[in-house]
């Protein structure tokens, strides 16, 4: 270290706004805030309050202004940047439109998402996060096999590269198509950015520091290509109204960028790009004008209310729609046509009621006087607090509910061709009992008994063939044993709705006494009804005006071929009476009922095994799954989990359960991504209407950050 004078040394700092490098004489015990104060020219009338020191070589912000240079580790050979904390980020919304937004690059990613959602009028921002856009190359190899790119940083003498911290997601995109730090976002001759399809507006010069939060008179102006820019002349109302309605289809170049997985392996590799919520986005290789995707990350949506969540519901509907069109989820043919019909109804209602005319929410109470408004508000409050069935007569609460009927049963066995056998089923207290006859159920012991608590439930329904089957993967009675597979077949849809609802509740550890049983039955009936052949005449529409590729996945397009439009219009007759908001809500509910909904996949290797397997992470459990078939080998519930932690040195994760410990390494993503998913879902489970308080950001980071 070269010292100049008494315990002083030279520190080089680049003021990025002015592109001027200054050399200050400092001491090691000088505070960071004092260094910034010495940088500012008092004669220059500029607001520097949004600026902070960034250390490119270490890839960290020096935001603790009371810390000294010695405490921060800054030495004479260090080179710092004095740069704005708020920078422009291009954000792709779930409906695939882009907006340019001023984000605090020094705040934790979680805080940046919360701030963005607040401006966009999206409640419960903890359900969303940023992820880096992917390209086809990312699906060809596991994360562990991808070239381990370091984060490029600008130094005085050129570009340097730093290794991401061990306890963060170290994924850096292979190419520079979305990342500006390697020069890929240099402006073109017409001033447009190259990080995404060029937008027709000309980018303005850098605006004064500040965010839409601090500028309540700002607006976002949209154009036909799906881009939005910030203009400080009016309010956010136009933006929120626009985000509550989405165009029918994105531009062709945006759609062409979509990455379509072709197997379970590729679906698992889709999850490599999630940002670390505990670090700032700049510390994760994201630079100004780069693109990030805003997506619903945790598939547990709290208190969806059409009255308050128009933007949230629309963006959720759009994410659901694209997950189906992009073949991330694969519904049956009947389910696909139901989704297409609901989407067609959404588009039809949007054409009938453009933004600003009708929101799709029932406002009839406004016409009937103030007393009805009060009654309506009280009823809504009661439903919110008690649930949909709260006001109904629940009967004798001391009697344990029971379900019984004749059904067919099958336990698949290797090398046998045995078919279904008829039994008299009774279900009570999470236990399924099978008898040879109803008379035997009154006096004899059951022939077969199955504990359904924590089972995996998969529907197998074909309305055209009259097939109503339920596949159950039941936890083994042997300690640490694999799941066993059994099938239950119902005679009709009414029987199926009751038993399927019971099985779904059992999977969550809930019995028939749970207040949500009736609503679960009603939801299943409603979904089946929408998949039936329509009774009424289809809407009079010119088939040539319907573009089937906007409603069907490529695989289903090939299957239906020339009959696609006709089948969509026939299915639409079932849902043609739905309002805009009802159609979106039905779509979301149907999406949530799909077998693979809400299961985030990762490729892993268990400790001591060379074989790759799938790990599924859901809102209440993690699952060991077969890589080829997707069968559930073993399920572990979060309520049996004592601790989970990561060895950051070898990127290995250990989960301590009541009966066993499991250790695995993650192949398809960084270990931090899995760690954060588990902690995030546990955080989501702590929410309740009785405890509907301010978002506890500290608790979120404690559960997801990998440190206490």
From Swiss-Prot:
**GO terms for biological process, alphabetical:** cardiac muscle tissue development; cell-matrix adhesion; defense response to Gram-negative bacterium; integrin-mediated signaling pathway
InterPro entries, from UniProt?
Answer: Band_41_domain, FERM/acyl-CoA-bd_prot_sf, FERM_2, FERM_central, Kindlin/fermitin, Kindlin_2_N, PH-like_dom_sf, PH_domain
**GO CC annotations?**
cell-substrate junction; cytoplasm
Q: Which UniProt keywords apply?
A: Cell adhesion, Cytoplasm, Phosphoprotein
Gene Ontology MF terms in the entry? cell adhesion molecule binding; integrin binding
Q: Which residues carry this modification: Phosphoserine?
A: 181, 184, 199, 215, 234
Domain FERM, residue spans: 274-602
Q: Which residues cross the membrane?
A: none
Q: Which CDD domains does its entry note?
A: FERM_C_fermitin, FERM_F0_kindlins, FERM_F1_kindlins, PH_fermitin
Q: Which domain of life is it from?
A: Eukaryota
Q: Which Pfam families match?
A: FERM_M (PF00373), Kindlin_2_N (PF18124), PH (PF00169)
Phosphothreonine modification, residue list: 211
Start and end of every PH domain?
400-508
Q: Taking the first listed entry, what is the main subcellular location of this protein, grouped into a coarse class? A: cytoplasm
What subcellular compartments does it reside in? Cytoplasm
Q: What does this protein do?
A: Probably involved in cell adhesion.
Mind telling me which PANTHER family this protein's record contains?
FERMITIN 2-RELATED
Give the family from UniProt.
Belongs to the kindlin family.
Relay the domain remarks: The FERM domain is not correctly detected by PROSITE or Pfam techniques because it contains the insertion of a PH domain.
- The entry's protein name is Unc-112-related protein
| Organism, as annotated | Drosophila melanogaster
């Amino acid at each position: 270290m070269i010292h100049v004078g008494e315990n002083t040394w030279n520190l080089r700092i680049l003021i990025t706004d002015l592109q001027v490098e200054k050399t200050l004489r400092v001491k090691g015990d000088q505070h960071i805030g004092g260094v910034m104060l010495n940088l500012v020219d008092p004669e220059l009338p500029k607001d520097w309050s949004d600026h902070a020191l960034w250390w490119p070589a270490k890839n960290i912000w020096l935001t603790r202004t009371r810390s000294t240079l010695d405490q921060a580790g800054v030495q004479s050979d260090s080179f710092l940047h004095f740069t704005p904390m708020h920078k422009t980020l291009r954000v792709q919304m779930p409906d695939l439109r882009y907006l340019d937004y001023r984000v605090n690059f020094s705040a934790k990613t979680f805080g940046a998402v919360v701030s963005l959602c607040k401006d966009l009028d999206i409640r419960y921002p903890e359900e969303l996060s940023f992820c880096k856009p992917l390209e086809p190359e990312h699906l060809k190899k596991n994360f562990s096999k991808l070239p381990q790119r370091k984060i490029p940083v600008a130094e005085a003498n050129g570009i340097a590269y730093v290794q991401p911290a061990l306890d963060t997601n170290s994924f850096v995109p292979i190419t520079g198509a979305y990342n500006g730090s390697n020069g890929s976002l240099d402006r073109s001759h017409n001033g447009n950015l190259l990080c995404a399809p060029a937008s027709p507006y000309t980018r303005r010069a850098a605006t004064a520091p500040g965010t839409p939060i601090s500028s309540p008179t700002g607006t976002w102006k949209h154009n036909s290509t799906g881009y939005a820019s910030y203009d400080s002349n009016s309010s956010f109302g136009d933006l929120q109204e626009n985000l509550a309605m989405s165009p029918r289809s994105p531009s062709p170049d945006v759609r062409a960028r979509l990455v379509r997985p072709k197997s379970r392996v590729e679906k698992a590799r889709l999850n490599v790009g999630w940002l670390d919520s505990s670090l700032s986005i700049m510390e994760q290789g994201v630079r100004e004008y780069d693109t990030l995707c805003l997506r619903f990350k945790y598939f547990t949506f709290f208190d969806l209310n059409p009255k308050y969540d128009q933007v949230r519901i629309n963006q959720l509907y759009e994410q659901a729609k694209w997950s189906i069109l992009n073949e991330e989820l694969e519904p049956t043919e009947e389910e696909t046509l139901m989704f297409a019909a609901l989407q067609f109804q959404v588009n039809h209602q949007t054409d009938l009621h453009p933004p600003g005319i009708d929101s799709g929410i029932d406002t009839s109470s406004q016409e009937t006087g103030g007393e009805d408004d009060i009654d309506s508000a009280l009823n809504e409050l009661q439903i919110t607090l008690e649930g949909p069935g709260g006001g109904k007569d629940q009967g004798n609460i001391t009697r344990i509910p029971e379900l019984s009927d004749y059904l067919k049963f099958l336990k698949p066995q290797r090398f046998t061709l045995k078919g279904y056998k008829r039994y008299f089923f009774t279900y009570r207290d999470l236990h399924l009992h099978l008898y040879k006859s109803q008379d035997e159920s009154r006096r004899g012991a059951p022939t077969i008994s199955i504990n359904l608590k924590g089972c995996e439930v998969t529907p197998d329904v074909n309305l055209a063939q009259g097939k109503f089957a339920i596949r159950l993967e039941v936890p083994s009675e042997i300690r640490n044993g694999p799941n066993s597979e059994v099938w239950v077949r119902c005679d009709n849809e009414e029987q199926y709705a009751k038993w399927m609802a019971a099985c779904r509740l059992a999977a969550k550890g809930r019995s028939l006494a749970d207040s949500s049983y009736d609503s679960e039955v009603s939801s299943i009936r409603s979904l089946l009804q929408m998949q039936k052949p329509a009774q009424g005449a289809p809407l009079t529409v010119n088939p040539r005006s319907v573009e089937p590729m906007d409603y069907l996945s490529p695989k289903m397009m090939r299957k239906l071929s020339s009959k696609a439009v006709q089948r969509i219009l026939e299915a639409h007759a079932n849902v043609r009476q739905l309002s805009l908001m009802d159609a979106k809500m039905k779509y979301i509910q149907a999406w949530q009922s799909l077998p693979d909904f809400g299961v985030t996949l990762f490729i892993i290797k268990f400790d001591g095994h060379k074989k790759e397997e799938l790990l599924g992470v859901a809102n209440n459990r993690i699952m060991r799954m077969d890589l080829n078939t997707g069968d559930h080998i073993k399920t572990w519930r979060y309520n049996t989990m004592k601790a989970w932690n990561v060895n950051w040195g070898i990127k290995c994760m250990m989960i301590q359960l009541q009966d066993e410990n499991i250790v695995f390494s993650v192949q398809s993503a960084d270990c931090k991504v899995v760690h954060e998913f588990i902690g995030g879902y546990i955080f989501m489970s702590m929410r309740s209407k009785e405890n509907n308080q301010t978002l506890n950001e500290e608790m979120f980071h404690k559960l997801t950050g990998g440190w206490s």
